[in-house]
C-alpha cells in the first residue's frame, strides 16, 4: 500500500476516502496519543487552516480526535502554514497542524503536522502516526470526564505572529506595494504586516468564499498582479499561494521575480552584512544555473538538494546554514523561522529594496538566468517511470544532443499525478523541442 503521508503531509480531494472527516478524526487521535506517550502528561495541539470550504469540516474532525484522546486544542482559524509553526513554538504546544493544499484547487485539501519545535515531522514520526491510524483494533485511549480535551481560540497568538513578522523588517514608508493574496490564508495578514511597516498597500483577491482560493490568482497566476503593479505605478508586487508558505515578486516594470532571484538578492544582502552563515545558500536541483554562477562570483557556496522545502531545511539544519529555498518561492530564513514563510520573505525582500534605495528590477537583474523550460506531464501512474527503458532512452538522447551545454532533470511530483521535465540550456527553442520529445514519450509510456 502507498504511504499515507506524501512529501507535504496527507493530501487528497476533501470528503473522499483520501481525505475524509473520519481520517482527520483518526489523525487527531493518533497525534494526541503519540504526544501523550512522549510527554507523559496533558498535551496541546495548535490547528490552523486556509480558506477552503472543507477547512472548517476537517478542523472540527481533527479537533474532535485530539480531544477524544485527551489533548487540548488551540484553534487559530484561518492562518498561514508558517503562522501555525510559529504559534506552536510560541505557545510551547506539543504539536501543530495545518489544514491546506497550498497551491492546489479548492476541492483539494491536506493535513500537515509540525512538531513542538515548529519543524515538519520527520518520516519516522509520520509512519508512527499512520500505524496508529491503521491499527485494528483501535487501542488508543478514550478518556472521559475531566480527562477529555478542550478547544479554545487564541487571537492573541495570531497577533504575536504578526508582531514577529513586523519585528524582522525595516521601515517601508515610501514604498507602494501590490499584494495578491490569492483569496488564501494570507488575505488579512500580509496586507496588515506591510501596512504596519509603513508601506502603501494595494491588496488584491482578499475576499475568500471557500471556493475561489488560487482561482486564476495568487503565486501561480501572476498576470493580474503584473498588470496592477504597472497600473498603480507600484514599486513592487507580491503574490502568495493558498497557505502563504511562499511568495513570488513582481518588479516596478511588472516583470516576474522568482524564488531564485529572491534568494540571490537576500543572499547577497546577508553576506554584505556578515549575516550569511558559512557563506552558503541551500537550494534544489530545480534552481537556475544563473543563480549558481552569481553566487560563485560573490564567494557564496551553493548546495543543491532534492526538490521539496523539507529537503532544503534538512540540509540547512545539518550544515548549520541560514538561508535556503526553492525557485517556486519557498524561502527559509533559518534565524527567523522554522519553515518557508511567504510574508516573511516579502518583508525581507522589500526591506532590502527600502535600504538599498534601488529599484527591484536592478536588484533582480544581478542574476542572469539561463533559458529554462518546464513541461508538466499528466500521467495515469507515476510508479516505475525511472525503470522505463523508453523514457530513459529519451532522456539520454536529449542529454547527448545538449553536449554538456545545459542539463536535463526529470522527476515525479510528490503531490500530483505529474512527471516534471525541466531542461536548461543556451537556446530556448532548442530546449523546448527536447522537452517536448521527452514529454511525448512519457505520455505514451505512462498513460
From Swiss-Prot:
PROSITE patterns linked: PGM_PMM
EC class (word): isomerase
GO molecular function, one term: phosphoglucosamine mutase activity
UniProt catalytic activity: alpha-D-glucosamine 1-phosphate = D-glucosamine 6-phosphate
EC number(s) per entry: 5.4.2.10
Record-listed Phosphoserine modification sites: 102
Entry annotation: catalytic residues: 102 (phosphoserine intermediate)
CC cofactor note: Binds 1 Mg(2+) ion per subunit.
One record GO biological process: peptidoglycan biosynthetic process
Annotated binding of Mg(2+), by residue: 102, 241, 243, 245
Record key words, sorted: Isomerase, Magnesium, Metal-binding, Phosphoprotein
PTM field: Activated by phosphorylation.
InterPro entries (UniProt xref): A-D-PHexomutase_a/b/a-I, A-D-PHexomutase_a/b/a-I/II/III, A-D-PHexomutase_a/b/a-II, A-D-PHexomutase_a/b/a-III, A-D-PHexomutase_C, A-D-PHexomutase_C_sf, A-D-PHexomutase_CS, Alpha-D-phosphohexomutase_SF
Cofactor or coenzyme needed: Mg(2+)
Lineage: superkingdom: Bacteria
Gene Ontology CC annotations of this record: cytosol
Protein purpose: Catalyzes the conversion of glucosamine-6-phosphate to glucosamine-1-phosphate.
Family statement drawn from the similarity comment of this UniProt entry: Belongs to the phosphohexose mutase family.
Protein name (record): Phosphoglucosamine mutase
Gene name linked to the record: glmM
Amino acid at each position: 500500500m502507498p504511504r499515507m503521508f506524501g512529501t507535504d503531509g496527507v493530501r487528497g480531494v476533501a470528503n473522499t476516502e483520501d481525505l475524509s472527516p473520519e481520517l482527520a478524526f483518526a489523525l487527531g487521535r493518533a497525534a494526541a496519543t503519540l504526544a501523550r506517550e512522549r510527554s507523559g502528561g496533558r498535551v496541546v495541539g495548535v490547528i490552523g487552516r486556509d480558506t477552503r470550504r472543507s477547512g472548517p469540516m476537517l478542523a472540527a474532525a481533527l479537533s474532535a480526535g485530539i480531544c477524544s484522546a485527551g489533548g487540548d486544542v488551540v484553534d487559530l482559524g484561518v492562518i498561514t502554514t508558517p503562522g501555525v509553526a510559529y504559534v506552536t513554538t510560541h505557545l510551547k504546544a506539543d504539536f501543530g497542524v495545518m489544514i491546506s493544499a497550498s497551491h492546489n484547487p479548492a476541492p483539494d485539501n491536506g493535513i500537515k503536522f509540525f512538531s513542538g519545535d515548529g519543524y515538519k515531522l520527520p518520516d519516522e514520526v509520520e509512519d508512527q502516526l499512520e500505524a496508529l491510524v491503521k491499527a485494528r483494533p483501535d487501542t488508543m485511549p478514550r478518556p472521559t470526564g475531566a480527562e477529555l480535551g478542550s478547544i479554545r481560540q487564541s487571537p492573541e497568538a495570531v497577533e504575536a505572529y504578526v508582531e514577529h513578522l513586523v519585528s524582522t523588517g525595516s521601515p517601508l514608508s515610501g514604498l507602494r506595494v501590490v499584494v495578491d493574496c490569492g483569496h488564501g490564508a494570507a488575505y488579512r495578514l500580509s496586507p496588515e504586516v506591510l501596512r504596519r511597516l509603513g508601506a502603501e498597500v494595494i491588496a488584491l483577491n482578499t475576499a475568500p468564499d471557500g471556493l475561489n482560493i488560487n482561482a486564476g490568482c495568487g503565486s501561480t497566476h501572476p498576470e493580474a498582479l503584473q498588470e496592477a503593479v504597472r497600473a498603480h505605478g507600484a514599486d513592487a508586487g507580491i503574490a502568495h499561494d493558498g497557505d502563504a508558505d511562499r511568495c513570488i515578486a513582481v518588479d516596478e516594470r511588472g516583470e516576474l521575480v522568482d524564488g531564485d532571484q529572491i534568494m540571490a538578492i537576500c543572499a547577497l544582502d546577508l553576506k554584505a552584512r556578515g549575516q550569511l552563515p558559512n557563506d552558503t545558500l541551500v537550494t534544489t536541483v530545480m534552481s537556475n544555473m544563473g543563480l549558481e554562477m552569481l553566487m560563485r562570483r560573490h564567494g557564496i557556496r551553493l548546495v543543491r538538494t532534492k526538490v521539496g522545502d523539507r529537503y532544503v531545511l534538512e540540509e540547512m539544519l545539518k550544515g548549520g546554514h541560514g538561508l535556503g529555498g526553492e525557485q517556486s518561492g519557498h524561502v527559509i530564513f533559518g534565524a527567523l523561522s522554522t519553515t518557508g514563510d511567504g510574508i516573511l520573505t516579502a518583508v525581507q525582500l522589500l526591506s532590502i529594496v527600502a535600504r538599498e534605495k534601488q529599484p527591484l528590477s536592478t536588484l533582480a537583474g544581478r542574476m542572469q538566468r539561463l533559458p529554462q523550460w518546464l513541461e508538466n506531464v499528466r500521467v495515469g501512474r507515476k510508479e516505475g517511470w525511472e525503470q522505463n527503458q523508453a523514457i530513459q532512452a529519451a532522456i539520454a538522447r536529449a542529454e547527448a544532443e545538449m553536449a554538456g551545454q545545459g542539463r536535463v532533470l526529470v522527476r515525479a511530483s510528490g503531490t500530483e499525478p505529474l512527471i516534471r521535465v525541466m531542461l536548461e540550456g543556451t537556446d530556448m527553442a532548442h530546449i523546448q523541442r527536447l522537452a517536448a520529445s521527452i514529454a511525448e514519450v512519457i505520455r505514451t509510456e505512462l498513460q
